[in-house]
Amino acid sequence: MALAVSDMEIYQHMTPQMLAQRQTLLNASQAVVLDTNLPAESIQYLADHCTAPLFADPVSTAKAVKLKPVLGKLHTLKPNRIEAELLSGVKITDDASLQKAAETLLDTGLHRVFISLGSDGVFAADRSGQQVQLPPLPGAMVNTTGCGDAFMAAITWAYLQGTDLTDTAKAGLAASVIAMESAETINPAMSEDALRQRAAFSK
């Protein structure tokens, strides 16, 4: 990608009123994925009224604060290290504080958290007490645009496949590296088969 212009104004049209008109559709979904480009009141509406599992991407530290009031109503959260610090109130300096940040987030009622660690991979934890830290998968870096979105899409897909925490984290890492290997924003080689092969699921 050489240049991109993003007009975020469209998100302002995604009001609670608009979402209410689509409540039946939302509740019939297997999962609903949101990010913090949505207005805070719309995020709150989804947290209060959507019965489908909610997967949330904090997007940035400036916008992540919108999730603080609704953390306990989310199913899955995918913050990076800095966003996890902001939302948990725990400064992450080592493995112990990383685990503490994840546990603090889960204590809100959140079901799963996947903390992106950049070149250190990902740390994942769930309410059952399971925790796993995985390194990034090897790959040729061509373009990092869309890697985070690919990770979020993959962990949502993996949840719908019924995978465990470890394989879900593997799916996220696999999608990220597949996305990274193409000059296109969405790698044409991205597929369910490619994801399964790259992730090397344990089951």
Q: What are the residue ranges of the model-derived segments?
A:
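Ribokinase/PfkB-type carbohydrate-kinase core domain
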Residues: M1-Q131, S191-A194
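Conserved phosphate-binding/catalytic region of the ribokinase-like
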Residues: K63-A64, K68, D95-K203
